[in-house]
Regions:
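Extended, well-ordered protein cores
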Residues: 1-14, 24, 142, 150-151
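Extended active-site and interfacial segments that coordinate phosphate-rich ligands
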Residues: 12-38
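Extended, charge-enriched "interface" segments that sit outside catalytic cores
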Residues: 41-168
């Protein structure tokens, strides 16, 4: 219940919940960066799809060049969250990894290219494992269930009803 148990623990505030979510994203970015670095080191093949060549241009290491921006985004996300949590620097959400699709889309392109260029074994190895983890865990590693003490919900509903239907009470 870390960060989500608001139905009996007065210490769990919205800022605590936000911090827990950021810590989870921080850890995810660190783990994904590590995995991407391993892939980049192992993908020395030159033969690739036109889709990758359009992005990388003529290079002897197209897969490495193609995957580096994703790895760098993981690193940037990890560092930005750490700077925010430790040094209280502002967090620019536009620079952070924001969806699992940001991870999966380039990995799908790499996998398709590897398969089309007779590298099915490589496409079905660590790359596929990383894709499965990204699909399963997304950018935060875990879902956070937030439990709120029920009188808070009652109060919120009362405020909505009071504002919207106050004029009907006098009829």
């Amino acid at each position: 219940w870390m960060g989500g148990d608001r139905d009996g623990n007065p210490n769990v505030t919205s800022s605590i919940t936000k911090e827990v979510i950021l810590l989870s994203r921080w850890e995810a970015a660190k783990l994904y960066e590590k995995e991407l670095t391993k892939l980049i080191r192992s993908f020395s093949m030159e033969k690739c799809s036109n889709k990758i060549l359009k992005v990388t241009g003529k290079t002897f290491e197209p897969y490495r060049v193609f995957l580096r921006p994703l790895r760098d985004k993981m690193r940037l996300t990890h560092r930005a969250i750490e700077n925010h949590l430790v040094r209280h620097k502002p967090l620019d959400q536009n620079k952070l990894l924001s969806s699992r699709e940001e991870i999966l889309k380039p990995l799908r392109v790499v996998r398709d290219s590897l398969e089309k260029n007779q590298n099915e074994n490589i496409a079905s190895g660590e790359l596929l494992d990383l894709m499965r983890r990204a699909k399963c865990f997304g950018i935060n590693l875990a879902r956070l269930d937030i439990r709120q003490e029920s009188s808070r919900h009652s109060q919120l509903l009362y405020e909505f009803i009071k504002k919207k239907y106050l004029s009907l009470i006098h009829i």
